[in-house]
Amino acid sequence: MLTQFSRTELLLGKEAMDKLKNSRVAVFGIGGVGGYVCEALVRSGVGAFDLIDDDKVCLTNLNRQIIATRKTVGKYKVDVMKERMLEINPDVNVRIHKCFFLPENADEFPFDEYDYVVDAVDTVTAKIELVMKSQAMNVPIISSMGAGNKLDASAFKVADIDKTQMCPLAKVMRRELKKRHVKKLKVVYSEEKPTRPIEDMAISCRNHCICPPGAEHKCTERRDIPGSVAFVPSVVGLIIAGEVVKDLCAK
């Protein structure tokens, strides 16, 4: 029978589509990367999701995040993403968590229900804990390395964390995971040398914050605010989604 997923089924086959429909993917971080992960996975037929993020859509997100429009500024990202996913597939099951993943609340998430975990968060502390928790529960995980301050979308590739180079975030992750005796982690990273952002206080969030009312204003507390473009984090998200689909279908 012809369905909205028929074109995908022509490539993957019915057995693979059934696997996707019966899978639950947890996406941690619904931003420039995570938003496109969700977009591609729901369009691919994944049947259930957990979305984790405590941020609200900010005006500065409009340059790259698929959930960001003038109408969604000020709304929780997980709410906007869920609404969008239901418009694509009314039968999708989406659970939202309006919080930031930390070691302190890691046990509150049902990792035993996840078939795959996507790490699209920004902080090293959260990323490390997410990797440790996922691997302890034998849940496959893929982690996004640095997408900020990059301009060459074609430079991103899939590799084990031990094979990465150039990426500053991957370097820190390698060191921290080695301390914890973690030997393998699938990541998406780039060997492009990061571009140094222009130091212009007139366009600095630190001095001219335009976060919506009620937001956490985290940007004003960050030591460095990376530059970003529409065509880089989106590609990272789509690469990650492709890996998730292939791995779920191969189970």
Model feature map: region roles:
Residues 1-26:
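N-terminal charged helix/coil linker that caps or initiates catalytic domains
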Residues 98-106:
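Conserved SAM/SAH-binding loop
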Residues 27-29, 52:
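Conserved N-terminal Rossmann-fold NAD(P)-binding element of oxidoreductases
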